[in-house]
Structure formats: structure tokens, C-alpha cells
Amino acid sequence: IFQEDDIMLAVSYVLFIAQEQQMPLSICIGLGTSMGAHQGEGPLNEYINSIAAFTQNAVSVPAGNEGTARHHYLREFGPNDTEDTVELRVGDRESTRGFMTEFWGDSPGSYYMTIQSPTGEKLSVSTALKNRTQELSFVFVETKVLVNYVPIERRTGNTLIFIRFLHPAVGIWKFLVGERIPGESRFHMWLPVRGMISDDTYFLEPSPEYTVTSPGDAADAMTVTAYQYRDNSLYVQASRGYNTENVVKPDFAAPGVDILTASIGAGAEFAPATGTSLAA
């Protein structure tokens, strides 16, 4: 796990060395996160775009392995359709560790949310406490939910609801989502990437689209997905585009299934590995 500014510092260092040596530079950032609006926004994405604007620099990043993870939910509202129920299954591991999820509603919009526990208890998220942390305490399941409601997120202009679960009860949690302004709009919800959350926590009606991780959604990064070089089939778990601004991502595919690489474990020096980071 790396902070975004740590990655930016590392990139800045190798960029300085390349300029000092007057050499072209190729950077591979084999990491990704599913947090954010997936518009290609954010300090790291903007930094990558600024570097990739120069022809002597190339930045390759993985698309991610979220295609079949069931970590993304998408709903599009029509003119007469303003409410939806999002169902999320919470597993045993998260009941002790907790987890987080993000809601992003397209602007212009005025979204509201009620959270329902597996026992049926409902608590509403206040839209009045803007940018402040709300604590929702469920009585029958002894769960606390910390919520930050941001009506206009400063980089995107979209509505962000940041939700953190503390000791969530195992079972089906529901998010009752509504839109006060009739018309066409949509919202997304994303869970953390594989490895940061167990496979037992997922949306019951997921969407595999818009699952390219950040910084893979950056406009000028070379975003790489993976395929099986033996039969030219795409890697089924690879994340899928576009980004939410409809920029085409990933940009291309490279071999990334059962690639022989150096082993970090005991025993063999080399072992097969799979993923879009290897493809990048």
C-alpha cells in the first residue's frame, strides 16, 4: 500500500535522473485503486498527464483486475425513475475489519440516501451536514457507519458520499438511493480493489463496466489490459472501460496470463503469475 504522494515523489525522482542524463524515460506504475470518480481526475493522474505530454516520456499503467470482482454498481435514472435500491453482501472478514465504499452521483443532481441493515433497521444520511462526518449507530446489529456527504466535490462537481462501516453485521445491507431532481442522471458505487476487501463482500447486481482503476483512467497514460497469449483470449478478470468521461480505456492489450516471472516466495526462482500489472 502506497500513498499517492509517495508514488509522485518516486516518479519525480526518475524524471529528474532522466533529464539529467538526457535520456528518454519509460515508467511502469503497476498499482491501482478503485476509489475516486473514475474521470481521470486526481493529483497523480494530472501529474502523469503532464509527464506523458512530452514525447520522450512514456507512462504505462494497468487497467486493473476488477472486471469480475462485483465491486461496482451502476444505475441510470430516467425522467420518471428517481429511486433505486442497492444491495450489498457483507462477508465475515469485513465484520471484524470494517470496510468503505464510495457513492458518486452525476451532476447536476440532488441525491439522498437511507442505509438499511440486515435486520431491517433504517437510518437516513443527512444532506444538511455538508462536508462533515455523520455517525449512524444501528441498535440491533451494533454497527456504526461514518458518512461524509459532499454535494459538490471540488474536482468533479459531482455528488460524493463517502461511507465507512465499523463492525458491520454479516448479511445483505441496502442503500435506498433517490434523486430529487427529475430527469436523466446516473450514479456509481465502488468498493475497494481485490486484496483490500474479501471476495465475500460484493454487490448483488454489479456492473463490470467503468472498473478501470486509477491511475489507469488518466487520459494520457498508456492503460494496458491483459490477454492469454496462448489462445489470444482476453483475461476475464481484467477491468473494463470506459472511464466515466467516456475516454476510451484501456488503450491496448498485452500478454498477462501465466507469465513466467521472478518469484517472491521461498523455493523456485521463477513462477507463473497473472494480472494486468504484468501486462503493463
PLM regions: where:
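Loop-rich non-cytosolic ectodomains and luminal regions
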Residues: 1-280
